[in-house]
Amino acid sequence: MKRTRSALPANFDPVYPYDAPKPSTQPPFFNDRKGLTESSPGTLAVNISPPLTFSNLGAIKLSTGAGLILKEGKLEANIGPGLTTNQEGQITVEKDSDGLTFTSPLHKIENTVSLSIGEGLEDESGTLKVNFPSPPPPLLFSPPLAEAGGTVSLPLQESMQVTEGKLGVKPTTYSPPLQKTDQQVSLRVGPGLTVLNGQLQAVQPPATTYKEPLLETENSVSLKVGAGLAVQDGALVATPPNVTFSAPLEKNGNAVSVRVGAGLSIQGNALVATTSPTLTFAYPLIKNNNHITLSAGSGLRVSGGSLTVATGPGLSHINGTIAAVIGAGLKFENNAILAKLGNGLTIRDGAIEAVAPQPSFTPVTLWTGPDPNVNTSINGTPVIRSFISLTRDSNLVTVNASFTGEGSYQSVSPTQSQFSLILEFNQFGQLMSTGNLNSTTTWGEKPWGNNTVQVQPSHTWKLCMPNREVYSTPAATLTSCGLNSIAHDGAPNRSIDCMLIINKLAGAATYTLTFRFLNFNKLSSSTVFKTDVLTFTYVGENQ
């Protein structure tokens, strides 16, 4: 006989036998609008914007401009001599400061600043005032002098002029191209003109040549223009290129604007960073001073600034996923690692076993014969006619049975006590003499060609017995059992219950089948004890 193996759970995994699967930790597992981002992909980083930046050590720091300074981890105003801050944090001038100097007419004496004043000025109740002198007597003017609105003027004829405050005769003036040299008047001529024999004449110009971008065509000169230039209404103009704008830039008419998101705004035509809300960090993120770290538990680790899954022997990272490294004799099937089995091998109870070639199987039936006598005893008295057949086909055994009472068990009432009919078999599947249906009655194998009973034992009888590994402890099946159903035409209150108990061992028996009849109180009155055909199945024993 084979050694009985301890049963394993149906979901037992021999390759990865852990109590519970670990949760997946593949990124992303964060909200990229809540202070975190991926930089580069698959790497967790803090999402910051100016004035926040990173130091050379990777810590978050604050960039400061003119007038600001970081002191002992706090942002303060950078103030110079003569200035200080009061208890309210306001910038004020120092009382005993030498930062202010005074020059005449201002003078500082202790805590008082005074103003020196001269003639024509006076201090009237703290107000500086000008003292005007008494006006002189009015003046009288005679021609050619004239007075108008407080101004004295001298009328001049066309030949007179005032030069540097002096009255003189206005000289004769000549406008270009006439010019006066000493006492002579001459005519200035430019290119293309000359004076010959006292006469103004035109000078014939030399032949004109044109270089690019000028182009002469017949009697006209034109200008060749390239990309970005054009001639419109006789004028050279620049044509704007076809410029496209990508986000965050956008064009509206002739104006180009920039779109801003959270943390940015436009103030005074300048892009500035708005104050970001205070960052809070939830587990597994931990903030320590100015550093943010990620708490990694079992199965995780931080490597090269990235969160990765810690793998042990037999596991590796392939294309960003965890894969098992398998060798010869193993394979992947339905997301599980299985052993590759050749001919003659199988897996039983999680272990690889060698199996013998399966012979061709012929169904086996053990029975009482088609019309047995009163073959079952209760308390030593034959009182039940039992028809029982056990048929092994493939791995299952089908039980067909019916029972008819005789004598004191010909009829039963609602007060009938429950009773059992037991069949006991030895290790070879042979019926023993210790049960209610025993070896003294007709019992054996049914041939294929007739309805006789072959009582000569065979090694195949064991195949009809219950499998001892499957039914290592007693197992039961309860079914309703109708009594004399044909005569009563299936009337209600004419059924009891029958329980088949498998391998409830007692004494020297190796296998047992127990038919237990109970719940007679379901009957409405006395009834003939003639059961319907009962059918059960169980797993058969190995050869």
Swiss-Prot record:
What top-level branch of life does the organism fall under? Viruses
Q: Where's it mainly located?
A: virion
Task: Show the InterPro entries listed in the entry.
Answer: Adeno_fibre, Adeno_fibre_knob, Adenobir_fibre_prot_rpt/shaft, Adenovirus_pIV-like_att, Attachment_protein_shaft_sf
Q: What induces it?
A: Expressed in the late phase of the viral replicative cycle.
Q: Which UniProt keywords apply?
A: Capsid protein, Host nucleus, Host-virus interaction, Late protein, Viral attachment to host adhesion receptor, Viral attachment to host cell, Virion, Virus entry into host cell
Region (Disordered), start-end ranges = 1-36
Q: Which Pfam families match?
A: Adeno_knob, Adeno_shaft
Keyword Translocase present in the record's keywords: the answer is: no
Q: Which cysteines are joined by disulfide bonds?
A: none
GO CC term, one of those recorded: viral capsid
Answer whether the UniProt record assigns the keyword Iron-sulfur to this protein: no
Output the GO biological process annotations, alphabetical, semicolon-separated: adhesion receptor-mediated virion attachment to host cell; cell adhesion; symbiont entry into host cell
**Record's subcellular location:** Virion; Host nucleus
Biological role stated in the UniProt entry: Forms spikes that protrude from each vertex of the icosahedral capsid. Interacts with host receptor to provide virion initial attachment to target cell. Fiber proteins are shed during virus entry, when virus is still at the cell surface.
Sequence similarity = Belongs to the adenoviridae fiber family.
| Swiss-Prot/TrEMBL domain comment | The tail region anchors the fiber to penton base capsomers, whereas the shaft, built from several repeated motifs, allows the knob to protrude from the virion.
Q: Quaternary state and partners of this protein? A: Homotrimer. Interacts (via N-terminal tail region) with pentons.
Misc. comment: All late proteins expressed from the major late promoter are produced by alternative splicing and alternative polyadenylation of the same gene giving rise to non-overlapping ORFs. A leader sequence is present in the N-terminus of all these mRNAs and is recognized by the viral shutoff protein to provide expression although conventional translation via ribosome scanning from the cap has been shut off in the host cell.
Q: What is this protein called?
A: Fiber protein
